């Protein structure tokens, strides 16, 4: 899935007697979940901006809402879809949303280069989902196979730095790769033969989607070739919220972790809840693709070494160091500038 978005519209959905609606606003549509709680007391509203339309990555949120876990913590969570690529970080930084789901390396870059006052409060995915993907017929299984090839990407500095790193890792010449800015068209650029491979596709989404469409594909992971392991998704809050609303953020993380525990225990139930909350107009979901996506995500959202939402100083240090080395950031931010570990 891409990290650049169009304006969104949505229709009302009905889920197990609990209504889910979408309302417009200058900061993009909001999915308001009403019901599924204990019905007692006033709830504190939390606006949560997703990185994309609802998909398997967000299933734990919808499970937690459906089962009333946020309400039991005194929270009413409003899910908001981004209207622009950086809404999850920009709206949170400006105090126009409470929590965003965004990307670790973008958080580092925003803090280091622009002093954007946000930090990660929890890692949703413990490793990279981004891959180098190609049709199997292209015979590409490592960076060395990219020499002399056209590689599609979304035109970002980060992707260029990743390609430089993986080529250097295998002793190959970066200048031998022809990077082609294909914008949003990562999959179609491969299937039409415009490029030989792409960087920017996600192993949990584009791989099962292309396989469902009948394509044989191959891919390799970036962190096997010199790119540090990074968190594909992190929850963000702004500095003021971290300083003043720690208990609220802790309650959100606690309820989210309960939703994830249920996702692990009953993935088919979680899939049904997700499908009932999909944005059919703008991003209809395939049950087969989302089931495959969940199977990929579950062991990456929590590992034997890292609990769901945990984040390590080592991961942050390695990514800061790599980004500084690649010229992606102007300075190395302190760890406390980019992450906080909130007990929950």
Please place each PLM-identified region on the residue numbering:
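Positively charged n-region of N-terminal signal peptides that target proteins for export
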Residues: 1-4, 8
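Bacterial Sec-type N-terminal signal peptides, specifically the leucine/valine-rich hydrophobic h-region
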Residues: 14-15
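Short, glycine-/small- and polar/acidic-enriched structural segments
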Residues: 38-183, 187-192, 196-204, 219-220, ...
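Pocket-lining segment of extracytoplasmic ligand-binding domains
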Residues: 105-106, 185-188, 193-280
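Secondary-structure end/capping motifs
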Residues: 243-326
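Conserved C-terminal helix/tail region of periplasmic/extracytoplasmic solute-binding proteins
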Residues: 314-344
